[in-house]
A protein has these predicted regions:
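Helical hinge/lid and interdomain linker segments adjacent to catalytic or ligand-binding clefts
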Residues: 78-165
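Aromatic-Pro/Gly-enriched surface loop or interdomain linker
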Residues: 1-115
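A glycine-rich, often tryptophan-bearing local segment used as a flexible ligand/cofactor-contacting loop or short
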Residues: 129-223
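Alpha-helical protein-protein interaction elements
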Residues: 18, 36, 47, 122-123, ...
Length: 223
């Protein structure tokens, strides 16, 4: 769920007429962050001086955290991503009569492995990309204690984030030094202001995703 906040109000540069036509044809959620910049954009966008946005909060209207929102306007896919894609997993579990609970990243961060210890299996969402040391510790401890960790997503466990000690709803991301990234942190800005820790990729922090789930994101084509 940290991914929902980090991508919150992502204004994509390719929001074109074809996208709007698809929204109308599918009767999808009609509003898009590109049209409502006064609510604040995502950490995949830029400030007016072209510096990358490194802070995000879910305590504001988030256009792309709504059922039926289409993330991608072109191509032959569903156009769904993150929350909307995850909702299909919930619907499938309900249709199959499989009981489940939802555990948020915040619960993992605050309660650690205790929040998931009593479960036999844990399945991630479709895009578990952003993590704190505490959430990774919880998942690793769950796995090492015999839990079945099912990773069916993509680009998981990639970026390190920090939460504000004064307001845990605030998330910070520093896109430093390497990796596929929307913008690059400037020299001297690789460390989080919230906790002083080195940011960037988990791989550069000694915890590549392969250590946790055996596979990890390396590169991408046109996106």
């Amino acid at each position: 769920t940290f991914t929902y906040t980090v991508y919150g109000n992502h204004a994509r540069p390719d929001f074109k007429d074809r996208w709007r036509e698809r929204i109308q044809d599918w009767n999808a959620y009609p509003h898009n962050p590109a049209d409502f910049r006064h609510y604040g954009l995502s950490t995949y966008n830029f400030h007016s001086d072209n510096s990358g946005i490194c802070y995000a909060s879910a305590q504001r209207p988030l256009m792309n955290l709504r059922p039926g929102y289409i993330t991608f306007g072109e191509g032959n896919g569903s156009g769904l991503r993150h929350y909307q894609a995850d909702s299909h997993l919930y619907a499938w579990l309900e249709a199959k009569g499989i009981d489940f609970d939802l555990i948020t990243d915040r619960e993992l961060h605050e309660e650690g492995v205790d929040s998931i210890r009593d479960y036999k299996a844990l399945c991630t969402g479709s895009h578990p990309e952003y993590h704190t040391p505490q959430t990774l510790d919880a998942l690793q401890n769950f796995r090492d204690q015999g839990g079945r960790l099912v990773y069916l997503g993509g680009n998981g466990f990639y970026w390190k984030i920090a939460l504000s000690p004064e307001d845990p709803e605030l998330i910070e991301i520093r896109r430093g030094e390497s990796g596929i990234r929307a913008w690059a942190a400037e020299p001297g800005e690789y460390y989080h202001s919230f906790d002083g820790s080195y940011g960037g990729l988990w791989r550069r922090n000694g915890r590549p995703p392969q250590l946790l789930v055996g596979v990890g994101f390396s590169a991408q084509g046109k996106f």
